[in-house]
Amino acid sequence: MSEAKRLAAEKAIDYVEDGMIVGVGTGSTVAYFIDALGHIGHRIKGAVSSSEQSTARLRQHGIEVLDLNHTGNLSLYVDGADECDPNRCLIKGGGAALTREKIIAEASERFICIVDPSKQVPVLGKFPLPVEVIPMARSLVARQILALTGGQPVWRDVVLTDNGNVVLDVHNLQITDPVALERSLNQIPGVVCVGLFARRPADVVIVGGEPPRVL
């Protein structure tokens, strides 16, 4: 699938215009996008990064990393996904960067999601749903998620997010109404961010292949 990821990432370069500040996500597919962006880095003003990992890779390519507080809204955000449904709703957060990813997506006029074909699903939920949680609320949130959804929350106990929080991965879900579930989980005290991108889905999904498909 690495070739499909690369092809999707390189297709996303078509959406980058001269003088842009580009929002950049996190993950293995985005790494290919950053590498491709490095070839045209002289054409853009810089990037806003969703993780320390992506920041380091951008700087390796000589791309200036800017603070979202100073840039205002962005024209373009490019990121991957763990799952994508036919409505371009996503599960994200396998790399534990979901909160910053959601912030940048919200601040961007256009969200381009780059995936390999294995990420396309008819219904979200086979991939465990990440939920970023304040550490002291971990058990409380897990109990409430279990009661609300029937899914099984599992603490990703070797991981802290870049924000210093923990991640619960919710297994055994079949998410037929992603917008409603995103809204409900966000109401639980202690939840920082839910890895459902449904209220603000992708505007365009690029599926890697020969040739890439644009949805």
Swiss-Prot record:
InterPro entries referenced in this protein's UniProt entry, alphabetically: NagB/RpiA_transferase-like (IPR037171), Ribose5P_isomerase_typA_subgr (IPR020672), Ribose5P_isomerase_type_A (IPR004788)
Annotated GO MF terms: ribose-5-phosphate isomerase activity
List of residues binding substrate: 26-29, 79-82, 92-95, 119
EC number per UniProt: 5.3.1.6
Top-level lineage group: Bacteria
List of catalytic residues: 101 (proton acceptor)
Keyword line: Isomerase
This protein's record includes keyword Isomerase: yes
KW tRNA processing (keyword) present: no
GO cellular component, one term: cytosol
Reactions that this protein is recorded to catalyse: aldehydo-D-ribose 5-phosphate = D-ribulose 5-phosphate
GO biological process: D-ribose metabolic process; pentose-phosphate shunt, non-oxidative branch
Pfam families recorded: Rib_5-P_isom_A (PF06026)
Pathway: Carbohydrate degradation; pentose phosphate pathway; D-ribose 5-phosphate from D-ribulose 5-phosphate (non-oxidative stage): step 1/1
PANTHER family membership: RIBOSE-5-PHOSPHATE ISOMERASE (PTHR11934:SF0)
Function: Catalyzes the reversible conversion of ribose-5-phosphate to ribulose 5-phosphate.
Family: Belongs to the ribose 5-phosphate isomerase family.
Subunit relationships: Homodimer.
Record-given protein name: Ribose-5-phosphate isomerase A
Annotated organism of origin: Xanthomonas oryzae pv. oryzae (strain KACC10331 / KXO85)
Gene behind this protein: rpiA
